[in-house]
Amino acid sequence: MAEEQDLSEVELSPVGSEEPRCLSPGSAPSLGPDGGGGGSGLRASPGPGELGKVKKEQQDGEADDDKFPVCIREAVSQVLSGYDWTLVPMPVRVNGASKSKPHVKRPMNAFMVWAQAARRKLADQYPHLHNAELSKTLGKLWRLLNESDKRPFIEEAERLRMQHKKDHPDYKYQPRRRKNGKAAQGEAECPGGEAEQGGAAAIQAHYKSAHLDHRHPEEGSPMSDGNPEHPSGQSHGPPTPPTTPKTELQSGKADPKRDGRSLGEGGKPHIDFGNVDIGEISHEVMSNMETFDVTELDQYLPPNGHPGHVGSYSAAGYGLGSALAVASGHSAWISKPPGVALPTVSPPGVDAKAQVKTETTGPQGPPHYTDQPSTSQIAYTSLSLPHYGSAFPSISRPQFDYSDHQPSGPYYGHAGQASGLYSAFSYMGPSQRPLYTAISDPSPSGPQSHSPTHWEQPVYTTLSRP
């Protein structure tokens, strides 16, 4: 009993009364079999704000008395009796501005009052429970409680808050900065895991839109291999930044200017246009392209002044390729594939009949096709306008005949239309700009019934950069 007397003196000392939390782990086993005297000595000085904890500690002390044999309790008491509690260092904030002051914790809210009390009880009853599973269960139980069940915890939390305000009148909450601050805050507000569901939903939506972009890379739109902005079947919206992985053909080489511009116009990245009616906003989005400057488009043309003089290749073919690239907003050059007959240069007197096939979409109903005769040497060019109603203007021959044999006069010589490539492509209104164009197989065939998602004929050429 002398050891217990010494310990009770330590507990009743001023240092012991200032540090009730430090004593609580060791004081519970140090009580004798009667257990009452030591407990009353320890709890002679707590304020009214700790009455709820006092009752809980009494129950824990009684449970611990049954858990440990008498010899263990006496050994613990002997060790603790000679310990000077003034040597215990005070906790300090490592990254705080005032390192001399101890860190003051926030007052517990109602859920924390419930969770702390229930966690101690459940941890004693079910020691095999993992702490994370225990937290999930406590959160679920708290959400199932009605207002009458929550009332005692709410009242206790309010009382703790008022007591905390008295004890620390100049207290100011200063949260520690974390890298993932929003995620931690969401998990604190939703203790049961609602934050995880929200994060999973956002990730799932992002990968859904990314999946739509490369679902049919081989049978999609003609530019889908080199331009992931137009997913097959879902090409009903303005161009959005590429979201496909960088393992695809050229999605990693997308033009940063186009990405920045489309982000600036759209304002929201990665919108899934599969379920959006684009009829109302397409004109508004395309009207923003009126601010393009001619000098900005000049940088995509070859430096020697003419669109066409590239080696011994057909000049008209490269003139057409660069013009189509400028019109569709892509900086990729269209190389000459081995199996495609690009238009050949002939004297001005020889005119071969060719057709420009234009696909137009009415306001409602399936797309229909009109064949416009033109005195051009372009073999068979499919100019597809999937969204915008007016037909593509017929392209006449002198705009594409550039070679070493011919003077550059036809660049300005055509009287029926405005002069030059810019008149045919860059100055069209918002309802006439094509989103993508492609060079098709030269073998002429009759009008086929195309389904929007599967382009079987004509066979499109693959586009690559030299």
UniProtKB/Swiss-Prot annotation:
Modified residues (Phosphoserine): S24
Phenotype on disruption: Defects in Sox10 are the cause of the mouse mutant dominant megacolon (dom). While dom/+ heterozygous mice display regional deficiencies of neural crest-derived enteric ganglia in the distal colon, dom/dom homozygous animals are embryonic lethal.
Polar residues compositional bias, start-end: 440-466
Disordered: annotated span: 1-67, 160-200, 213-275, 344-375, 433-466
Alphabetical list of Pfam families matching this protein: HMG_box (PF00505), Sox_N (PF12444)
Low complexity: bias regions: 23-32, 183-200
A GO CC term assigned to this protein in UniProt: nucleoplasm
Name of this chain's protein: Transcription factor SOX-10
Lineage: Eukaryota, Metazoa, Chordata, Craniata, Vertebrata
Gene this chain is encoded by: Sox10
